[in-house]
Amino acid sequence: MSPGADVRSIDGLREWIAAAQVFGHDAGEALGGTQMEIRRAFDWIAEQGHLWERAGRVGEQEVAQAKAELAARRFPNFDGKMPDTTVQERNLRRAEDRLEHAREQVLKCRSWAGRLPKIVEESFTGRGRRLQNFLEGELPRTLGQLARRVEALERYAD
C-alpha cells in the first residue's frame, strides 16, 4: 500500500489551487497576446511590402521625370553653349537611389513574408498549441480533481 499524501494544511492546498488558476488565466492571456502579436507582424510585413511597392512606382515616375529634365538640358542654348546639367544629373542619381532602395525593401519584405511562417512554426506553433491544450484541458481537469480531493479531506477532517 502506498504511503498517504501527508497533507498538513488544507488551506495551503486551496491557496495552491487558486494560484494555479491564476497561472492558467495569466498564461492563457499571454498566449493570446503572443498570437495577436504574431498576426500583427504578418500584417505589418504585408503592409510594408505594399508601401514599398507604391514607393517603387513613385520612384519609377521620379526617375522618368529626372531623365526627361536631363534630356531637355542637353540641347545647346541660343548662344550655342551646352547648359550645365549637374543639378539634373544629381537629381537623377538621387531618384535612381530612392528607386533602388524601394526595390530592395520590397525584396526584403517578400523574403520575410516567406520566412516568418517557418520561424513561427518552428519556435511557437507547436509549443503554443501544447500549452493551450494544457491550459484548456489538463489544468482544469487536474484542478477539479484536486478540488474534489480537498473537499473529501475537509469532510474527513470534520
Segments predicted by a language model, with ranges:
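Extended, helix-rich structural scaffolds rather than catalytic motifs
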Residues: R129, N133-D158
